[in-house]
Amino acid sequence: LEEAAERGTVVQYLLSDAGQKAAWSTLSEMLNEGDMLYFSHGFGVTYKDQTGIIPPAHVDVALVAPKGSGTSVRRNFLDGSGINASYAVHQDFTGKADERTIALGIAIGAGYLFPTTFEKEVSSDLTGERGILIGALSGVMEAQYNVLRKNGHSPSEAFNETVEELTQSLIRLVAENGMDWMYANCSTTAQRGALDWHPKFRDAVTPVFEDLYESVTSGEEARITLEKNGDPNYRENLEEELSVMHNSEMWQAGAAVRSLRPENWKE
């Protein structure tokens, strides 16, 4: 860490948020005048009261935040397709921080770059992760699966109607054409039901999202993240939590369903 930071002119600080907090005292001493301190997330700087990450005045500070997982960023980079990303300049010491940041965004394969701030990036990112991208998505899936199972549907049927059809068919069409296209091109029965139930789901979960956003912007989610992820027993505790999901009937059914996809057939 020390050698890379001392020799580099663009220091990409890409440790986990808890890791950035732990290593900051070392890294901060290695930054040279005119360097760029580059983040892929606004967490450390935004929640400086909790992380202690306050960049020195003699460096540029910026971020490029890909809108996808690291796996997706790498996979898309290798196949030349790239992934959307936001960018922000928090501190422009050299007068060239904007140009340097955009160049870095292009270099990592971002096909579309849109401006933000460190604060807006972290509040939208944490809300999205805990919300529709992972937390809410898995929660809603689990709720529907459980209702179907409670009413006598088999694990395979419940999983296919809840997850497989969404991930293998519908979400791809939404990605290609938009949700409005999906509504216009599904069966009339699905169309009528979706139009009627969409506002009910929206109104039911809006208070949850409002609570979530407040928890993010107040710094409470940052506190929980740093506390949990900085625990010496973090890995063991995480494995225990993840094993509950992995061993659940729903996701065991999912493993069986995925194994039956044609691309997974063994010769």
Report residues per predicted region:
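A broad, structural surface signal
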Residues: 3-6, 25, 29, 142, ...
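Catalytic cores of large soluble enzymes that bind and process phosphate-bearing ligands
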Residues: 15, 19, 93, 136, ...
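Rossmann-fold dinucleotide-binding core
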Residues: 38-130
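NAD(P)-dependent Rossmann-like dehydrogenase/reductase catalytic/cofactor-binding core
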Residues: 150-267
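A generic structural-conservation signal
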Residues: 1-2, 114, 157, 183
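Rossmann-fold NAD(P) dinucleotide-binding segment
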Residues: 1-53
